[in-house]
UniProtKB/Swiss-Prot annotation:
Family label: Belongs to the RRF family.
Subcellular location: Cytoplasm
The entry's keywords: Cytoplasm, Protein biosynthesis
A Pfam family of this chain: RRF
Biological processes annotated in GO: translational termination
Chief location category: cytoplasm
Function: Responsible for the release of ribosomes from messenger RNA at the termination of protein biosynthesis. May increase the efficiency of translation by recycling ribosomes from one round of translation to another.
Protein name per UniProt: Ribosome-recycling factor
GO cellular component annotations of the record: cytoplasm
PANTHER family: MITOCHONDRIAL RIBOSOME RECYCLING FACTOR PSEUDO 1 (PTHR20982:SF3), RIBOSOME RECYCLING FACTOR (PTHR20982)
One GO MF term attached to the UniProt entry: ribosomal large subunit binding
Length: 184
């Protein structure tokens, strides 16, 4: 592979990785502790991840249990969960917070699939933008006579193959997540 392409391929990989991270946060009817990854609570004036101030476990398929290390954090954690877009209502017994995931309705599943497809499309746009930037950089090199026209054409073909590979991977990740959501 041409060294001039590597930074652009890295950017495409980052776009794909970002999509995969976003998909982790989309719940598919099962309890997944990673849904809490982006939530922050105020811990002595410092925004902290829930996993950093509590023990998070999944005792049942549709229940996340959060056991804060300090009882005073229960209210903070509940506030963060309610303020998030998870659509969950926390319940607590004074020591432990439980998040019960209701069964997803057919309508909600379809909405989630639409969201999954939208995020995938945004990632494809990002990958194509990286391709455009790469092609522009190669054209500048050719214009400055740093590479020949043949090299330019070869590199552009290589960039297109890499772009196609990432677009295919985005489609595969999207299909897998859509199937996961639609599986009852």
């Amino acid at each position: 592979m041409n060294e001039k392409i590597k930074p652009f391929e890295g950017k495409m990989q980052k776009s794909l990785d970002s999509l995969k991270e976003e998909y982790v946060g989309i719940r598919a009817g099962r309890a997944n502790p990673h849904l809490l990854d982006k939530l922050r609570v105020d811990y002595y004036g410092t925004p902290s991840a829930i996993q950093a101030v509590a023990n998070v476990s999944v005792p049942e398929a549709r229940v996340i249990q959060i056991q804060p290390w300090e009882a005073k954090l229960i209210k903070e954690i509940e506030k963060a969960i309610i303020a998030s877009d998870l659509g969950l209502t926390p319940s607590n017994d004074g020591k432990v917070i439980r998040l019960v995931f209701p069964e997803l309705t057919e309508e909600r599943r379809k909405d989630l699939v639409k969201d999954v497809k939208k995020k995938a499309e945004n990632t494809k746009v990002a990958v194509r933008n990286v391709r455009r930037d790469a092609n522009d950089a190669i054209k500048k090199l050719a214009k400055a006579n740093e590479i020949s026209e043949d090299e330019q054409k070869q590199i552009e073909d290589e960039i297109q193959k890499i772009t196609d590979k990432f677009i295919t991977e985005v489609d595969k990740v999207m299909e897998d997540k859509s199937k996961e959501i639609l599986t009852v």
